[in-house]
């Protein structure tokens, strides 16, 4: 996986997420404090094209981490290349960090953009559920099967997040 184009694509998408955080930093009183950024976001400090662009790049970065369809392409190769313990940790813990980013960062800081993007996130999640489940049926390698089942089960998580109901 090291040096592969899939890994390179993941790094590029993560760089976009970094740009989103830098935009929030410079527009939000030069702070990375999540509570302060949430307060600024809910008070209307982040609006218009800026807010939409920041939500888009945060979405892109977190969606790769989830992994959300169609940004999941790195996952089967990562599971296959990883030792079994690494594959289990990837499926059990690390994939949840993207959804945590949505719940704790993107949605609270940019709630209006989250509402606007929720239908698209729900559609992509539903496609991911179906795609991941069907791809599981075609797998003969257990690690790839776990990877595609992770795409499906994280689709359910993201579908719940897209509903924007209080936790």
PLM region descriptions:
Residues 89, 122, 146-147:
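Hydrophobic/aromatic positions within or immediately flanking transmembrane alpha-helices
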Residues 1-7, 11:
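Single conserved hydrophobic/aromatic residue that forms the stacking wall/gate
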Residues 66-80, 130-149:
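C-terminal ends of transmembrane helices
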Residues 47-52, 128, 146, 153-156:
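Aromatic-enriched alpha-helical transmembrane segments of multi-pass intramembrane proteins
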Residues 9, 13-20, 84-100, 150-163:
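Small-residue-rich segments of transmembrane alpha-helices in multi-pass membrane proteins
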Residues 15-72, 77, 102-120, 163-167:
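Juxtamembrane/interfacial segments at transmembrane-helix boundaries in multi-pass membrane proteins
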Residues 56, 119-136:
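Transmembrane alpha-helical segments of multi-pass small-molecule transport proteins
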């Amino acid at each position: 996986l090291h040096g592969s184009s899939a890994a390179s694509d993941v790094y590029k998408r993560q760089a976009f997420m970094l740009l989103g955080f830098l935009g929030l930093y410079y527009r939000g009183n030069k702070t990375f404090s999540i509570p302060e950024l949430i307060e600024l976001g809910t008070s209307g400090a982040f609006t218009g094209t800026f807010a939409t662009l920041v939500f888009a790049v945060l979405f892109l970065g977190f969606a790769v981490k989830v992994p959300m369809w169609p940004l999941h392409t790195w996952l089967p190769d990562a599971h296959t290349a990883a030792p079994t313990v690494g594959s289990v940790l990837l499926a059990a813990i690390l994939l949840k960090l993207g959804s945590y980013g949505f719940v704790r960062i993107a949605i609270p800081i940019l709630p209006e953009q989250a509402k606007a993007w929720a239908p698209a996130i729900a559609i992509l999640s539903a496609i991911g559920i179906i795609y991941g489940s069907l791809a599981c049926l075609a797998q003969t390698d257990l690690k790839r099967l776990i990877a595609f089942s992770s795409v499906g089960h994280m689709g359910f998580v993201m579908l719940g997040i897209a509903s924007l109901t209080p936790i």
